[in-house]
């Protein structure tokens, strides 16, 4: 394992790139919003390549909650960029060493603003997050979710690199990492051994660079999407790839913040969804006909993520990533494929009414 040398290499590379940019930094112009809304806005702005908004939300976090800024950048790198640009993921991970490193290579704002720029520009791949959704909810994994719970870690490691499907192999990784550390609303809790997982991946031939960057990313953010990038990286080497933009709905500003920042991860976003569900439109009539009263806001928050919040400006298209996205969107919500597509289309058309509810909540 060459983890320290690999990380030192990327820290040197990051320092050189920041130095080449010179002393002219973007304006530090924070917004007057909560840290939760700032985190939502920053991550979704990076997804959409909106550097202007990403910088302002990053400045907000750096001013009022800097620890949230660095953790959110880490999560965004693995969740939204991943195997599409592992170089960018590596640079973000390298910057997480701590304040002393960042002070030595230009300071907090110099480093954060540089990372925001390259993350906005990077091609995006959300396969790691889609993979986590599939593992939790796909019906084809019901037996494996139970069976793998009780297997010893050496057996899980063999399953993680065996002949099973990618979701089955990643499920074995999750249990071996430990669901006590990376919790799931579905998987049973058990202890794991993260060090054994990363060591084993190195031993059987995964590139040290890929494994040790994921190891450090996991150490910093404690999210299972970091180790998922290792098997996904190998899969990505086997398929033709190209990038294209998602079909993103028209944006509506609510003060200085776009409506799409108000999603299920923000209190105001859930309040707006609850108000929207009290209106009369095709989406709410569908909800009345198909969903029990309890849990409607949460369910529709997940649908909203698929039609607005989770969209990206430049998505990596490749067979495995496309399959995982399809499985997560249409085969996991507990609805038949036809109905999942139906409610997504209805909500997309009724987004102007949701934005009106967002305006009412925000003001």
Q: Would you name each region that the model predicts?
A:
Residues 1-24:
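Short, charge-rich, low-complexity alpha-helical interaction segments
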Residues 22-23, 53-56, 63-363:
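C-terminal alpha-helical interaction modules of replication/initiation AAA+ assemblies
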Residues 25-34:
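TPR-adjacent "capping" and linker segments in tetratricopeptide-repeat scaffold/adaptor proteins
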Residues 31, 38-60:
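Conserved helicase/translocase motor-coupling segment
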């Amino acid at each position: 394992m060459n983890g320290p040398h690999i990380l030192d290499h990327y820290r040197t590379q990051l320092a050189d790139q920041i130095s080449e940019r010179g002393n002219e930094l973007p304006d530090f112009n924070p917004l007057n919003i909560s840290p939760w809304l700032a985190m939502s806005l920053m991550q979704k702005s990076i997804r959409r390549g909106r550097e202007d908004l990403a910088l302002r939300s990053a400045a907000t976090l750096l001013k009022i909650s800097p620890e949230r800024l660095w953790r959110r950048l880490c999560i965004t790198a693995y969740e939204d960029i991943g195997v599409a640009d592992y170089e960018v993921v590596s640079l973000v991970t390298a910057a997480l060493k701590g304040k002393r490193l960042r002070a030595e290579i230009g300071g907090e704002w110099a480093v954060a603003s540089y990372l925001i720029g390259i993350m906005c520009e990077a091609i995006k791949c959300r396969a790691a997050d889609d993979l986590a959704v599939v593992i939790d909810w796909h019906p084809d994994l019901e037996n494996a979710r139970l069976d793998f719970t009780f297997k010893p870690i050496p057996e899980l490691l063999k399953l993680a690199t065996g002949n099973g499907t990618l979701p089955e192999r990643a499920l074995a990784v999750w249990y071996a990492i430990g669901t006590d550390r990376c919790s799931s609303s579905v998987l049973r809790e058990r202890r794991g051994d993260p060090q054994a997982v990363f060591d084993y991946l190195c031993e059987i031939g995964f590139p040290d660079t890929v494994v040790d960057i994921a190891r450090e990313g996991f150490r910093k953010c404690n999210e299972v999407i970091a180790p998922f990038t290792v098997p996904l990286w190998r899969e990505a080497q086997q398929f033709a790839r190209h990038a294209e933009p998602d079909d993103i709905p028209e944006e509506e500003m609510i003060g200085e913040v776009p409506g799409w920042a108000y999603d299920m991860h923000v209190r105001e976003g859930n309040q707006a969804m609850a108000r929207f569900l009290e209106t009369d439109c095709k989406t709410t009539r569908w909800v009345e006909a198909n969903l029990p009263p309890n849990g409607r806001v949460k369910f529709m928050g997940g649908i909203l993520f698929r039609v607005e919040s989770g969209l990206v400006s430049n998505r990596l298209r490749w067979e495995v990533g496309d399959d995982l996205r399809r499985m997560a969107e249409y085969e996991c919500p507990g609805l038949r494929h036809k109905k999942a597509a139906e409610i997504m289309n209805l909500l997309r058309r009724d987004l102007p009414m949701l934005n009106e509810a967002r305006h009412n909540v925000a003001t």
